[in-house]
Regions:
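Cytochrome P450 heme-thiolate monooxygenase catalytic core
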Residues: 41-46, 80-231, 267, 271
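Conserved cytochrome P450 K-helix E-x-x-R motif and the immediately C-terminal K′/meander segment
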Residues: 1-7, 178, 263, 271-312, ...
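Cytochrome P450 catalytic-core helices
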Residues: 226-253, 372-390
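Conserved cytochrome P450 K-helix/beta-meander segment immediately N-terminal to the heme-binding cysteine loop
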Residues: 324-351
Length: 420
């Protein structure tokens, strides 16, 4: 794909037999996502892979999406995330405490379980331990099947989800529905975004979403939070194992940090917001920024023009599919020196800017990830919990490859833990 698109700011490609304009110029991508976003709706090329409803934050309608984004924002902004840190740390500690020296672990499954536990506690608040464990197991299974779901090709073209994906979705949704029903009967016991969904109503007092739609919205939030975190953390731990010098520097930074490693938070294509008001991000955070540059979980995106637009030198009629890849944007040799190498120190002098989309691991604009601040803190905590306690190596004989499915994830990454 890189060879095909190199030197073409906009080029026509075919996806499943449908023509689309593929944009590689970061300034033009920024125009699509931010400046001219009102002229673009969500694309349909990859909708085949979706099994969730289009209510709430998945709404195709921009006004509806903005409404639910406003509902979610108070519970995911930086100040609110701080309140979730103790639970994040507890779940991270419990996850790594279950590992045994020398016994190979599926690192993506382990990170998925940790992320699912964090997501559940954030959305639902306190749950009975048995219920929480069951939800966590079902969510981890569903998230794994979602990760493996193709975005295009024959497997994605089918209108029916795979048997395993359908089974995982049905089982998790049924259990989740019972929890939502309990919260509907006692909405004051709900937490976070779920409480906002339960009490949201139109001007006539009628609930905006049905119980089923609330359940689907919860499924979407939980799976999105789980699959992306699991993928990013898997790559982070793999890269640490592959580069002892980077690992040593991360450990040194963590040793100097009493709590989470936040020294700055990369904004979705809009610059780096310093977490402490001054100075560059610390090495551990620069490492996470580099992981997200190399392996953004949402690696490809599609939009569709709602009206005729001019994009660079191209005039696009209404109904045109417009695609871009954060993976390719993040590896642009014109922006990044030696773009395929993991070099956290590049972020000492290089900062994401608001002028283009050369670094957008969480997207940008009105449909950028609403949980970005939450995700950064979660990644920091998980990285610290693992790296401080364990040294991981890739199991001998393993061949790790990137799988570009719903997320960009390592294909079956087995790692062997040894205590520090």
């Amino acid at each position: 794909m890189e060879r095909l698109l190199r030197g073409h700011p906009v080029r026509t490609v075919s996806v499943d037999g449908v023509a689309a304009e593929f944009v590689t110029d970061p300034a033009l991508v920024r125009r699509v996502l931010v400046k001219d976003d009102r002229h673009y709706g969500k694309g349909e090329l990859f909708q085949k892979a979706r099994i969730l409803s289009r209510a709430g934050l998945l709404a195709q309608d921009d006004a509806l999406h903005r409404h639910y984004r406003r509902l979610a924002h108070p519970y995911l902004r930086t100040a609110a995330v701080t309140g979730h840190v103790p639970v994040m740390e507890e779940i991270a500690r419990d996850t790594v405490a279950s590992w045994r020296p020398g016994q190979p672990i599926d690192i993506q499954a382990q990170m998925g379980r940790a992320a699912s536990g964090i997501a559940l506690s954030t959305l639902f608040g306190a749950l009975p331990r048995e219920t929480s464990d069951m939800l966590g197991e079902h969510l981890a299974a569903l998230s794994w099947e979602m990760i493996r779901k193709p975005l295009y090709g024959n497997a994605a073209r089918s209108q029916q989800p795979t048997r395993r994906l359908a089974g995982a979705f049905t089982g998790f949704r049924a259990l989740l529905a019972s929890c939502v029903a309990g919260r509907l009967n006692s909405p004051d016991t709900a937490a976070g975004y779920l409480s906002a969904l339960l009490t949201d109503a139109g001007r006539d007092g009628t609930p905006s979403l049905s119980a089923g739609q609330i359940c689907d919205e919860a499924v979407m939030m939980l799976t999105a939070a789980t699959v992306t975190t699991a993928s990013v953390m898997s790559w982070a731990l793999y890269l640490l194992a592959e580069d002892p010098l980077v690992e040593e520097k991360v450990l040194k930074d963590l040793a100097q940090t009493a709590g989470p490693v936040t020294g700055g938070v990369a904004g979705g294509g809009g610059g780096v917001r310093s977490g402490h008001g001054q100075g560059p991000p610390g090495y551990a955070l620069r490492f996470l920024m580099e992981v997200l540059r190399l392996y953004p979980p949402v690696w490809i995106t599609c939009r569709k023009t709602l009206s005729g637009v001019t994009l660079g030198e191209h005039v696009l009629p209404a109904g045109t599919h417009v695609m871009f890849s954060s993976y390719l944007l993040h590896r642009d040799p014109g922006r990044y020196r030696d773009p395929h190498r993991c070099d956290p120190d590049r972020w000492l002098s290089l900062r994401p800017t608001a002028q283009d989309a050369s670094y957008i691991p969480f997207g940008a604009g009105a449909r950028g990830c609403v949980g970005e601040a939450f995700a950064w803190r979660e990644l920091e905590i998980l990285l610290g919990a693992v790296a401080r306690e364990w040294r991981l190596t890739v199991r001998p004989g393993s061949r790790v490859r990137a799988a570009a499915h719903t997320t960009l994830h390592p294909q079956r990454l087995l790692m062997v833990p040894q205590p520090r």
